[in-house]
Amino acid sequence: MKPVHAFMRLYFIAGTQDCLHLDGDPAQNLLNILQQALQSGITCYQFREKGKKALQDPDKIKALAIQCRDLCRQYQVPFVVNDDVQLAIDIGADGIHVGQTDMAVADVAALCHSHCFIGTSVNTLEQGIAAQANPLIDYFGTGPIFPTQSKEDPKPVVGVDFVSTIRAHGIDKPIVAIGGVTTQTAEELRRRGANGVAVISAITQSADIAKTVKELLGNAQ
């Protein structure tokens, strides 16, 4: 597997709750969007089935996650599970992403037995310093950079300067910038030190996924 920083160039996150604006079955819509995104060049995908409008049946969630995993494997793109460590283990995910209020990273690592790379979310400089010092954390998502409607409980906006601040404090682990990122802002975030950007609605709501992915990758292609 490539170094983790190579996967961060364009990190796509989505679940069925992000596909409700489309007609038809949300699960099938997610699979269709994911396949188009993979064909177009995303470098990592995180299965994030979360919130009141997401699937609630564990069996349906697992079945859909397996379909997403299999699509990612066809394109040799890492498949990451958000928060649900047991699901990640059960279906052989490549990575697991946990927030500050999810399972402790040490517990995640103990369960995964080094089979998954581990990412976490960072919203403050103090969290970034702690993530840098924790050898179990392979990368972290910083944000939200801009206001976002994709999450039900978004943290305070940190702005583009936060990425520069993180780097200025000697934090050199792979960083993916997330939260309201668009084709107009992705390159600026990379210039400030992010290894890449993570998006939800920029792709799920795109009328031309191939074009959007190309623009989000920009000079990182």
UniProtKB/Swiss-Prot annotation:
Residues that hold 4-amino-2-methyl-5-(diphosphooxymethyl)pyrimidine according to the record: Q46, F47, R48, E49, K50, N82, S121, K151
Pathway annotation: Cofactor biosynthesis; thiamine diphosphate biosynthesis; thiamine phosphate from 4-amino-2-methyl-5-diphosphomethylpyrimidine and 4-methyl-5-(2-phosphoethyl)-thiazole: step 1/1
Cofactor(s) essential for the protein: Mg(2+)
Top-level taxonomic group: Bacteria
SUPFAM superfamilies: Thiamin phosphate synthase
GO CC, alphabetical: cytoplasm
Record bears the keyword rRNA processing: no
Example GO BP: thiamine biosynthetic process
UniProt entry keywords in alphabetical sequence: Magnesium, Metal-binding, Thiamine biosynthesis, Transferase
Binding site for Mg(2+): D83, D102
Catalytic activity: 2-[(2R,5Z)-2-carboxy-4-methylthiazol-5(2H)-ylidene]ethyl phosphate + 4-amino-2-methyl-5-(diphosphooxymethyl)pyrimidine + 2 H(+) = thiamine phosphate + CO2 + diphosphate; 2-(2-carboxy-4-methylthiazol-5-yl)ethyl phosphate + 4-amino-2-methyl-5-(diphosphooxymethyl)pyrimidine + 2 H(+) = thiamine phosphate + CO2 + diphosphate; 4-methyl-5-(2-phosphooxyethyl)-thiazole + 4-amino-2-methyl-5-(diphosphooxymethyl)pyrimidine + H(+) = thiamine phosphate + diphosphate
Enzyme Commission code(s) on record: 2.5.1.3
Binding residues for 2-[(2R,5Z)-2-carboxy-4-methylthiazol-5(2H)-ylidene]ethyl phosphate: T148, Q149, S150, G180, I200, S201
Pfam families: TMP-TENI (PF02581)
Cofactor: record remark: Binds 1 Mg(2+) ion per subunit.
InterPro entries per record: Aldolase_TIM, ThiamineP_synth_sf, ThiamineP_synth_TenI, TMP_synthase
GO MF, any single term: thiamine-phosphate diphosphorylase activity
NCBIfam families the record matches: thiE (TIGR00693)
PANTHER family from the UniProt entry: THIAMINE-PHOSPHATE PYROPHOSPHORYLASE, THIAMINE-PHOSPHATE SYNTHASE
Family membership noted in the UniProt record: Belongs to the thiamine-phosphate synthase family.
Function: Condenses 4-methyl-5-(beta-hydroxyethyl)thiazole monophosphate (THZ-P) and 2-methyl-4-amino-5-hydroxymethyl pyrimidine pyrophosphate (HMP-PP) to form thiamine monophosphate (TMP).
Protein name in UniProt: Thiamine-phosphate synthase
Taxonomic source organism: Pasteurella multocida (strain Pm70)
